[in-house]
Amino acid sequence: REKLLVVISPNLTNPYYVMLLQGIESRAKEQGFGLFVCNTQRDLRMEERYLKMMWELKPLGIIYTCNPSHCFMGLVEELSREIPVAIINNQNEKLNVDAVELDNSKLGRMMAKHLLELGHRKVAYIAPPLTTRQKQRSKRVEGFLKEFAEAGIKDQVIIKAAREELDLDVAHIDSEYKIGYELTRELLEETKDITAIVGLNDMIAFGILDALYEAKIKVPGDISVMGCDNTLFARMHKVELTTIEHFVIFKGRDACDIIMKKISSHNNKYSDMEPISTYHVEYEPKLIVRGTTSYAGENSKKRRSKK
């Protein structure tokens, strides 16, 4: 039969997940495997439907590009006893399946350190819903706050996270961009003294940039902006985005390698194969400084005095 791998993704409009898919597909192709991609759109019913299809579809492996929803953790573990399963960004120790983890806390700290070195003290962090279902998001924010706490100015960070319902809003495929755009507009109404705004990922940062542009606020002269993921579009915006490169494509390849190792390790039951383990990504994250961050300077002071 066809050598088939299944990839379950929550979103294919965010370039981050497309890059993961590209990494998985390139490695799978090298090994003669085809892919079946399931886009859940963060819809619990769709996720459940896809998971229940797996017993009939019988793929040789399953890769989740984010954590499964909490209500399906047991179902995923049950599946993993028959089919190799790997999860990217799993930071839930209770889920007994193979995982490729990334130190999201470290990414947050790197973002904070860059802004602190540029003299930014009053900053905002814009994020999607910070739910237990998306633990990696919270880890990134926690890392950012920890760096500011060590500098003694944690109380100078404004966290603006979207409502939880937005994760379930399937109708708007550009929801992460809208989070950045709409929460930045709210932020500008609420406070006048921030010198930098961080987006949890590049898509949110693009929304931030457009909201600032509409408000005639100069980037980075008035407000610095930073994202994370180093997606292709980070180099294509009006002002190229400062971001963090954490080698997303390679994470996809790593997850595929885990599955291949499980498949090749034994031809008998999955329980006889390699033991469950967590694979930490070995690629060191890298700060990519482009055109959207600069020193906190006089432009910001002039903007505040005008208001």
Map each language-model feature to its residues:
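Alpha-helical recognition/docking segments in bacterial nutrient-uptake
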Residues: K3-K113, E117, E189-D193
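Hydrophobic alpha-helical segments within soluble ligand-binding/sensing domains
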Residues: V100-I126, E142, K146, Y177-E186, ...
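Short hydrophobic segments within beta-strands
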Residues: I8, C38, I88, Y125-I126, ...
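An alpha-beta-alpha
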Residues: M111-I153, M273-T292
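Short beta-strand elements in bilobed, periplasmic/extracellular small-molecule ligand-binding domains
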Residues: A28-N39, L145-Y177
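Flexible loop/turn connectors
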Residues: R185-K306
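Short acidic capping loops at alpha-helix termini that bridge into adjacent secondary structure
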Residues: K122, D155-I158, V219-V225
